[in-house]
């Protein structure tokens, strides 16, 4: 596809994001009166809109592998992170309300941050190190006990296509501390929605969901090693050309 057309489609998509974000943010004040699950559902219709706008405007489609591996019980999802796409898509793909761990500064983004503030997410100050981790464990326990799912990106930030970041043990520590299984997820969203790139490229994103891994009898390092091995092996299956 010619670059001018890609730019035009990406520009239209960006405008739709701005309009949808303003509309949903204003609507969020009315959603405050709803019970939490209904409020979550209403707010995450923004995510549905953006996902389908990306599909029909930019040609970004998706396919899901292993959806049947998701248990009917609280879990901690540990996912590869290449793009903003999965942070949008997972909120409405998963059958239970999602709890993201994210940097606190996102709450201060006009309109977008308003919606985040109305959800039971875990906002942390990364500079606080152990104190931030203690907050994740304490709040994560409460959210899991409420039947919600916690999602974390072990590499900590978006990674370029074909690369691998350092897997951190935070999600594994939470899993062991709460005796909650983890579910590894591989996703190749960076092919269509590269990090820090305005241009969105048409294509099909694969989300591959692995089987739950029990934390019982494992150290945090051992558990994360299992997660890392599955995710990185699966990345080479769903995006073989990137790792040639």
Give the ranges of each region predicted by the language model:
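Membrane-interfacial terminal anchoring regions of lipid-handling membrane enzymes
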Residues: 1-32, 45, 68-70, 222-244
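Non-catalytic C-terminal accessory region of glycerolipid acyltransferases
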Residues: 4, 133-244
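Catalytic core of membrane glycerolipid acyltransferases/transacylases, capturing the structured
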Residues: 21, 25-48, 55-57, 69-129
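Membrane-helix interfacial anchor on the cytosolic side
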Residues: 58-60, 64
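Generic preference for hydrophobic
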Residues: 64, 77, 100, 207-209
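Thr-Gly-centered strand-to-loop micro-motif
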Residues: 65, 101-103, 124-126, 154, ...
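Short amphipathic alpha-helix with an adjacent loop that forms part of the alpha/beta core around
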Residues: 66-70, 139-142
């Amino acid at each position: 596809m010619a670059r001018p057309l890609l730019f035009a489609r990406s520009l239209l998509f960006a405008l739709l994001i701005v309009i949808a974000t303003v509309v949903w943010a204003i609507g969020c004040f009315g959603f405050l009166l709803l019970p939490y699950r209904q409020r979550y559902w209403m707010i995450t219709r923004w995510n549905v809109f953006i996902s389908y706008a990306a599909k029909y405007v930019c040609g970004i489609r998706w396919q899901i592998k292993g959806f049947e591996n998701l248990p009917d019980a609280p879990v901690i999802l540990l996912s590869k992170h290449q793009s903003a796409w999965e942070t949008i898509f997972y909120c409405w793909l998963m059958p239970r309300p999602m709890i993201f761990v994210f940097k606190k500064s996102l709450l201060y983004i006009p309109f977008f941050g308003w919606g985040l503030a109305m959800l039971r997410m875990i906002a942390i100050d990364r500079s606080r190190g152990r104190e931030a981790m203690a907050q994740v464990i304490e709040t994560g326990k409460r959210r899991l006990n409420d039947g919600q799912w916690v999602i974390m990106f072990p590499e900590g930030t978006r990674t370029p296509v074909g690369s691998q970041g350092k897997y951190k043990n935070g999600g594994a520590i939470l899993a062991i501390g709460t005796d909650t299984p983890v579910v590894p997820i591989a996703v190749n969203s960076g092919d269509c929605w590269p990090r820090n790139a305005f241009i969105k490229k048409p294509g099909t994103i694969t989300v591959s969901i692995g089987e739950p891994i029990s934390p019982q009898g494992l150290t945090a390092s051992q558990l994360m090693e299992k997660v890392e091995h599955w995710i990185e092996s699966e990345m080479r299956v769903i995006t073989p050309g990137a790792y040639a």
